[in-house]
Amino acid sequence: MAAASVTSPGSLELLQPGFSKTLLGTRLEAKYLCSACKNILRRPFQAQCGHRYCSFCLTSILSSGPQNCAACVYEGLYEEGISILESSSAFPDNAARREVESLPAVCPNDGCTWKGTLKEYESCHEGLCPFLLTECPACKGLVRLSEKEHHTEQECPKRSLSCQHCRAPCSHVDLEVHYEVCPKFPLTCDGCGKKKIPRETFQDHVRACSKCRVLCRFHTVGCSEMVETENLQDHELQRLREHLALLLSSFLEAQASPGTLNQVGPELLQRCQILEQKIATFENIVCVLNREVERVAVTAEACSRQHRLDQDKIEALSNKVQQLERSIGLKDLAMADLEQKVSELEVSTYDGVFIWKISDFTRKRQEAVAGRTPAIFSPAFYTSRYGYKMCLRVYLNGDGTGRGTHLSLFFVVMKGPNDALLQWPFNQKVTLMLLDHNNREHVIDAFRPDVTSSSFQRPVSDMNIASGCPLFCPVSKMEAKNSYVRDDAIFIKAIVDLTGL
């Protein structure tokens, strides 16, 4: 893997775990998955044990201090002192990030046809897809982002409204229930047909309306007819004999039990007086409450308007925060790229000779055998300050015909800032060496580029296809003679012939 400076995971923290697996439009490879959340890596960090984690996941794990790597434990690869997750030894895996961000992606939201790369999805589409399902804060239902405003204003059953009659605040779902008790709700008189009579004055209208049907005054003694107010006198004249008969019958019944009447009469009179006093008191209270209800309704309407304004402000601020978070995330990525470039510049050479030290050889070899990190790229080096840009690629467990038996070493022509000034195809002799620490038996291989190969044409992407030696050095030779591996490190040297440049 390309060398990188060790940076705290917190510096790239975007408070988001890995990408959903449903984003990939191609078959998913295990190397792209976070060892913690098992989703696609987002801002990958590599621990010293070789496992990769999302920046968010690693920060969450390390929030309570250094931890054992659960992936090492699960895979049976735990090593004391190596399988430890800690901020000081984890570093941003920019090579893995570039691979992940270049993967083809499709939007997982139903109905959306967007396609692109993971990098484009994160920067331009994630969180902005019109088909994204979001939760309505009022009714808790799921609505598409593009329909959220219409839902909030027109369809949400919990949307805040004001009664059109009394202006009291009310949700849409409770509006019909409110109409049943609203003091300003318009009623229609069945007698005269007058409409839009407020409920609070309807009884006064009924008492005054000549067309309203009321009980006959003699209903207490047995007359059950309902008569219009204006015809009440005619009814009493027409039913005079019947009313007198009812009165006589009632009188005779009362006369038959005078003791009971004498006992009940004063008690009923007293109760009536008490009830009349209470009614008068309650009427005064109702008047006060009506005025208070009107005042509260006006206040509630003002609060409702202010609430809507506040909600609009909150939504606008929330959008700004999201934009700022996205902007900070992009700046963090740019900063990581700059850190990577500075780190590479510190070890770059400009004379065509490059010595690459690979530390932690034992661990990196185990990772290559396990398939977690099969290849490692060196920092870039140059033939001159304005010359060709190159790097090395090594497979510690071999590649192709050398897999499992040899160390494979390749030479890579990279896209440089001055390619337009250089001669193409690249045609300089390349010598590759595995250095013997005793300076006696260096493993050496050299080749002159095949100018017809695409590996040595002017690069159109970050780097050309690697070319070199899949059978560079047998693993058995390295293990049998400890002069190649010393202090758990090996040194690889590349020499580019500058003749003709």
From Swiss-Prot:
It is found in: Cytoplasm. GO terms for cellular component: CD40 receptor complex; cell cortex; cytoplasm; cytoplasmic side of plasma membrane; cytosol; IRE1-TRAF2-ASK1 complex; membrane raft; TRAF2-GSTP1 complex. Its EC number is 2.3.2.27. SMART domains: MATH, RING. Phosphorylated at several serine residues within the first 128 amino acid residues. Phosphorylated at Thr-117 in response to signaling via TNF and TNFRSF1A. Phosphorylation at Thr-117 is required for 'Lys-63'-linked polyubiquitination, but not for 'Lys-48'-linked polyubiquitination. Phosphorylation at Thr-117 is important for interaction with IKKA and IKKB, activation of IKK and subsequent activation of NF-kappa-B. Residues 298-348 form a coiled coil. It comes from the Eukaryota. A zinc finger (RING-type) spans 34-73. The modification Phosphothreonine is found at residues 7, 22, 117. Changing residue 283 to A: Reduces interaction with BIRC2. A zinc finger (TRAF-type) spans 124-180, 177-233. It catalyses: S-ubiquitinyl-[E2 ubiquitin-conjugating enzyme]-L-cysteine + [acceptor protein]-L-lysine = [E2 ubiquitin-conjugating enzyme]-L-cysteine + N(6)-ubiquitinyl-[acceptor protein]-L-lysine. The modification N-acetylalanine is found at residue 2. GO terms for biological process: apoptotic process; CD27 signaling pathway; CD40 signaling pathway; cellular response to nitric oxide; innate immune response; interleukin-17-mediated signaling pathway; mRNA stabilization; negative regulation of apoptotic process. E3 ubiquitin-protein ligase that regulates activation of NF-kappa-B and JNK and plays a central role in the regulation of cell survival and apoptosis. Catalyzes 'Lys-63'-linked ubiquitination of target proteins, such as BIRC3, IKBKE, MLST8, RIPK1 and TICAM1. Is an essential constituent of several E3 ubiquitin-protein ligase complexes, where it promotes the ubiquitination of target proteins by bringing them into contact with other E3 ubiquitin ligases. Belongs to the TNF receptor-associated factor family. A subfamily. This is TNF receptor-associated factor 2. The lineage of its organism: Eukaryota, Metazoa, Chordata, Craniata, Vertebrata. The gene is Traf2.
